[in-house]
Amino acid sequence: MDAKTSIKNRLPSRHVTEGPERAPHRSYLYAMGLTTQQIHQPFVGVASCWNEAAPCNIALMRQAQAVKKGVASAGGTPREFCTITVTDGIAMGHDGMRSSLPSRECIADSVELTVRGHSYDALVGIAGCDKSLPGMMMAMVRLNVPSIFIYGGSILPGNFRGQQVTVQDMFEAVGKHSVGEMSDADLDEIERVACPSAGACGAQFTANTMATVSEAIGLALPYSAGAPAPYEIRDAFCTTAGEKVMELIAANIRPRDIVTRLALENAAAVVAASGGSTNAALHLPAIAHECGIKFDLFDVAEIFKKTPYIADLKPGGRYVAKDMFEVGGIPLLMKTLFDNGFLHGDCLTVTGRTIAENLKSVKWNPHQDVVRPADKPITVTGGVVGLKGNLAPEGAIVKVAGMSNLKFTGPARCFDREEDAFEAVQKRTYKEGEVIVIRYEGPRGGPGMREMLATTAALTGQGMGGKIALITDGRFSGATRGFCIGHVGPEAAIGGPIGLLRDGDIIEIDAVIGTLNVKLTDAELAERKSQWTPRETNHASGALWKYAQQVGPAVAGAVTHPGGAHEKQCYADI
């Protein structure tokens, strides 16, 4: 028995492969063509979110094969499986979006159940769309077996009449079309060229934001999260990940050794520096929750406030993920942040080395303008800002990257679901200067905390992005531009102040000092609360009903179970 098999006595897979009582289990493994040697090697789960719903995940199965080759070459036995994913680009703007955030929990739960049920010793997780990235990382830290995360890669930009375009331009084209600024023929032409390859949305939307997080938090190999999906180098990263996870097993380096409070602060810093998605303020607390670490929206916002915004990435800037990869990738961004004191260098990573050690060989690239030096930023504070006030006692979040005006005051225009707000935008029945309020769209009230990209993109397409504001207890896509505030808590469904608003109430937003208030006294709000009654949803059964019963507030990540702080034994220690 060699060194690879001799460690079996401390690994979970011993429960299904070792001893005479496991002869029935081994017979199943022989049925799949495994050799005796392979059965007694460490079992590595290779999980992907492959499906044919959208280009985001279509390349994942190919990459999984490369991971398996790496695992096998390093003396492990790869065991491939798939889990679900809900692609936001397809779910956006209709009832299907209610499934998006709950799918994050389903992904984490299904990966956990598969690994537990089959006693796998390690995990390489491959994800390609918004909720699958945090869902996979949540599973890794929950299980706490040696793990490496792999992003499936971003899509290449499209080309519309010589202009680089992304799916963001498609959603905004709908707004232009609604006001006669784009013809049917033009709309048809751009929709055929906007998304030319496999991969997730190419700008710094939620998928690329969480991909950036995966490197900064230490769960992904350096440079691996930046390469676009069609690039052949992705297979090399995947093969290396398969090899490296075997080293993690041997060294017994686990996700909770990597994902510490300081690593979470690093993750929040790269979100702010890259002008990333507000959804990170939901996903980072959820990942922390799996580790038993308290790290809520306010903790995230504190890091955002003191981190400079330095990456000129869409939607607030000019470039896409491919451009940043080609000038130095995420390590270039991290290098200048580290050199200027914005990252903790002593955090461990899946390389077995620290952040500082990984960045030691990274040289600054002066021949590019995608990433600025951290001491010469686009703005001195991050591209995402946390807010709090009498309208959001549990906080709210706004993406300010690319915005020039960070204050807004106006009368409320209230809608109790996104469809009604979108119809008002399409018909232009709103007024310039108003604050559009979309409520009962929170985690419990939606249920599912939908994103409002269809509405915000239509407003931008109509040229109103800087002339109105929008607040919601739901979420916004990473592709959203304009003064759009999400995650307002407490949500309307549980009687939060956003549910007490009436048309005409004056709302004051100040993203400079971080406040969100309505010009009502505490007594007026209390009087309205006494008259408020809960609303029923149309979901009285099924997965969304179950989610609504379990989900917690957005400020803590909208999680559905007690978390690592309450567990008595993590899976890796069975």
Regions found by a protein language model. Name each.
Residues 100-109:
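Glycine-rich, highly charged phosphate/nucleotide-binding loops
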Residues 71, 110-114:
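Glycine-rich, N-terminal phosphate-binding loop and its surrounding beta-alpha-beta segment
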Residues 2-52, 56-58, 63-82, 89-90, ...:
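Catalytic or ion-coupling anion/metal-binding cores of large enzyme and transporter domains
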Residues 114-136, 148-151:
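A short, small-residue-rich loop immediately preceding and capping a beta-strand
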